[in-house]
A protein has these predicted regions:
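Basic, Lys/Arg-enriched alpha-helical interface segments
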Residues: 2-91, 99-104, 113-124
């Protein structure tokens, strides 16, 4: 069953055949690495951990929050498909929003723990 986004993409880019252009077995796409890169440029102590997280996430095929918790037991699962990751021993926090069907991750927030305490992680 296709949804409105799939139909609009197929209308713009017609294809023939029976394959699904939204392959749920393909690796996740992380949008946007530049946000992480800009952050680790200012906070070089977390560069390696953010690069590792990015590489792991970009190679993953997570289908649900339980799969993320298996790999990241300290991650916090929030409503609306948001996940909070502790970075560098909880000195930094990374919030993502994930669409499991389309295998896409959006970076919603990266900041210090003090900055994280000032935001609403469920709404950012």
């Amino acid at each position: 069953m296709r949804n409105a986004l799939e139909f609009s993409i197929l209308k713009m880019f017609p294809i023939s055949g029976t394959f699904d252009i939204f392959d749920q077995n393909s690796a996740l796409r992380v949008i946007a690495k530049k946000i992480l890169r800009d952050f680790w440029t200012k906070h070089s102590d977390c560069e390696q951990q953010l690069k590792s997280w990015y590489n792991e996430a970009a190679g993953a095929t997570w289908k649900n929050p339980n799969e993320i918790k298996r790999e990241y037991p300290s991650a916090s699962i929030l409503e609306d498909n948001r996940i909070v990751f502790n970075i560098k021993g909880n000195n930094y926090r990374l919030i993502i929003k994930i669409n499991y069907h389309y295998q896409m991750i959006w970076i919603r927030f990266i900041g210090t723990h003090a900055q994280y305490d000032k935001i609403d992680a469920a709404k950012i």
